[in-house]
Curated annotation (Swiss-Prot):
This is Small ribosomal subunit protein bS21A. PANTHER family: MITOCHONDRIAL 28S RIBOSOMAL PROTEIN S21 (PTHR21109), SMALL RIBOSOMAL SUBUNIT PROTEIN BS21M (PTHR21109:SF0). Keywords: Ribonucleoprotein, Ribosomal protein. It comes from Chelativorans sp. (strain BNC1). InterPro entries: Ribosomal_bS21 (IPR001911), Ribosomal_bS21_CS (IPR018278), Ribosomal_bS21_sf (IPR038380). Belongs to the bacterial ribosomal protein bS21 family. One of its GO terms (molecular function) is structural constituent of ribosome. Residues 35-76 are annotated as: Disordered. One of its GO terms (biological process) is translation. The keyword Ribosomal protein applies. GO terms for cellular component: ribonucleoprotein complex; ribosome. Residues 35-52 have a biased composition (Basic and acidic residues).
């Protein structure tokens, strides 16, 4: 990964690098590789992530169709 440093502005270059790494998912992968994850734990995590994605998609779809308001339930 490469970031240009313009006018010796290292802080701006570091922010750009961090943003690129965040977008690529490098921080998340480093966290996951920090310790061994058993295959059963990996399956459970991936299944939970899939359920979370499906719920989010259903919520967005319902919101688009006007069935649910965009505000969270606690704010009502």
């Amino acid at each position: 990964m490469q970031v240009l440093v313009r006018d010796n502005n290292v802080d701006q270059a570091l922010r750009a690098l961090k943003k690129k790494m965040q977008r690529e998912g490098i921080f998340r992968e480093m966290k996951m590789r920090g310790h061994y994850e058993k295959p059963s734990e990996k399956r459970a995590r991936e299944k939970a992530e899939a359920v979370r994605r499906a719920r989010k998609l259903a919520r967005k779809r319902a919101q688009r169709e006007g069935l649910v308001s965009g505000r969270p339930a606690a704010a009502r």
